[in-house]
C-alpha cells in the first residue's frame, strides 16, 4: 500500500511539473503567435498605406461589387477601414462581412481576405478621422453616417504577390 501511495504521489508530481512546463511553453508560443500576427498586420497596413488606393470587394446576394478606397488604419491592435453608413457598401458589409481588399504597389500586389466587423464606438471613429483629417469635411465621430470596420482577428489572410518573387502569406 505504501509503495502504491509513493508511486501515486511521484506520478502526480511528474504530471503536475510536466503540465507547468507545457503551460509555460504554450504561453511563450502564444506570445510568439501574437507577435507574428502583429507584425503581419503592420506589414499589411504599411503595404496598403503606401499603395494609397485599394479596391474593396463585397457581395450583394450573388453579385460581387468592387470599389476604390483609401482609408486604412490600426486602432487598438486591429486593422480598420472607413466608409459611410448610408452607402451600399455599408449595407453589403452588414449583411455579409466577408470581404477582400486588393492593392498594387510597383510590381507587387496584396490580397487581403477576412471578415469585417462594424465598430460603432466614438473612439474608433475619432481615431480614423484623426489619421484622415480631410474626411472631417464629410464625416464626424458623432454623426450617424460615419462607419468604421475592423478585420476580425483570426479571419485574415494577406498574400503579397510579385512577378519576381514567391508569394508571402500572412495570417492575423
Which role does the model predict for each range below?
Residues 15-18:
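C-terminal motif of bacterial Sec signal peptides marking the signal peptidase cleavage site
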Residues 22-36, 111-172:
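Charged, gly/pro-rich active-site loop segments
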Residues 72-106:
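A short mixed-secondary-structure module that forms the rim of ligand-binding clefts
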Residues 46-61, 99-103:
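A short, Trp-centered hydrophobic/proline-enriched beta-strand micro-motif
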Residues 60, 85, 105, 116, ...:
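A mature extracytoplasmic/lumenal domain signature
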Residues 33, 37-49:
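Short, basic/aromatic recognition patches
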Amino acid at each position: 500500500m505504501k509503495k502504491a501511495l509513493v508511486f501515486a504521489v511521484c506520478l502526480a508530481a511528474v504530471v503536475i511539473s510536466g503540465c507547468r512546463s507545457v503551460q509555460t511553453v504554450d504561453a511563450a508560443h502564444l506570445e510568439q503567435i501574437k507577435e507574428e500576427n502583429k507584425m503581419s498586420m503592420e506589414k499589411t497596413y504599411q503595404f496598403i498605406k503606401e499603395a494609397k488606393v485599394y479596391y474593396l470587394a463585397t457581395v450583394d446576394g450573388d453579385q460581387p461589387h468592387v470599389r476604390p478606397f483609401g482609408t486604412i488604419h490600426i486602432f487598438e491592435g486591429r486593422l480598420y477601414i472607413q466608409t459611410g453608413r448610408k452607402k451600399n457598401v455599408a449595407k453589403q458589409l452588414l449583411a455579409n462581412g466577408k470581404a477582400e481588399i486588393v492593392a498594387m504597389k510597383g510590381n507587387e500586389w496584396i490580397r487581403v481576405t477576412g471578415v469585417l466587423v462594424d465598430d460603432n464606438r466614438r473612439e474608433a471613429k475619432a481615431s480614423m478621422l484623426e489619421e484622415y483629417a480631410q474626411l472631417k469635411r464629410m464625416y464626424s465621430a458623432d454623426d450617424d453616417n460615419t462607419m468604421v470596420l475592423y478585420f476580425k482577428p483570426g479571419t485574415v489572410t494577406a498574400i503579397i504577390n510579385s512577378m519576381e518573387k514567391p508569394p508571402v502569406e500572412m495570417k492575423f
